[in-house]
Swiss-Prot record:
GO terms for cellular component: endoplasmic reticulum; nucleus. The keyword tRNA-binding does not apply. It comes from the Eukaryota. One of its GO terms (molecular function) is cysteine-type deubiquitinase activity. It comes from Homo sapiens (Human). InterPro entries: Papain-like_cys_pep_sf, Peptidase_C19, Peptidase_C19_UCH, USP_CS, USP_dom. Its main location: nucleus. PROSITE patterns: USP_1, USP_3. It is found in: Nucleus; Endoplasmic reticulum. This is Ubiquitin carboxyl-terminal hydrolase 17-like protein 23.
Length: 183
């Protein structure tokens, strides 16, 4: 169960999460500042890039630019560790990167997708939300990643971390597309 104090001003706050989960009350917090995007950056939501007339316009935006903080406050303490379930270090490395990406963590902690998803089982966003929520609520502990996250990969065989990361991000993107079959 998530702490209601994480829900500030109508949205879940990853930036404030570390204050609540530190195993030591006197833990030092390090603020990591990232450069924000310029107003007319190629990555800016306001910028329109017409690369091809055949492309459909964007039907849905996951989050407005102002909801994507590029800075975070994290405790100096170690976060949740992931158990290696037999050559799954490629999964663990990718999951750690995704879990500690502030915009993604904010979106997952908001539960915005799972509140409207009609296919919780088999939905990569719902599966990833469960993992990120569990990882952020268990700092300093070792947790076992869900087997559903690596369902498309061979168990007991070493795989490529980049390939797994691309598979996961692609499956999460497809889960956001209206009318697309869940992966």
């Amino acid at each position: 169960m998530e702490d209601d104090s994480l829900y500030l001003g109508g949205e879940w706050q990853f930036n404030h999460f570390s204050k609540l989960t530190s195993s030591r009350p006197d833990a030092a917090f390090a603020e990591i500042q990232r450069t924000s995007l310029p107003e007319k950056s190629p990555l800016s939501c306001e910028t329109r890039v017409d690369l091809c007339d055949d492309l459909a316009p964007v039907a849905r935006q996951l989050a407005p630019r102002e909801k994507l903080p590029l800075s975070s406050r994290r405790p100096a303490a170690v976060g949740a560790g992931l158990q290696n379930m037999g050559n799954t270090c490629y999964v663990n490395a990718s999951l750690q990167c995704l879990t500690y990406t502030p915009p993604l963590a904010n979106y997952m902690l908001s539960r915005e997708h799972s509140q409207t998803c009609h296919r919780h089982k088999g939905c990569m966003l719902c599966t990833m939300q469960a993992h990120i929520t569990r990882a952020l609520h268990n700092p300093g502990h070792v947790i076992q990643p869900s087997q559903a996250l690596a369902a498309g990969f061979h168990r007991g065989k070493q795989e490529d971390a980049h390939e797994f990361l691309m598979f996961t991000v692609d499956a999460m993107e497809k889960a956001c597309l209206p009318g697309h079959k869940q992966v």
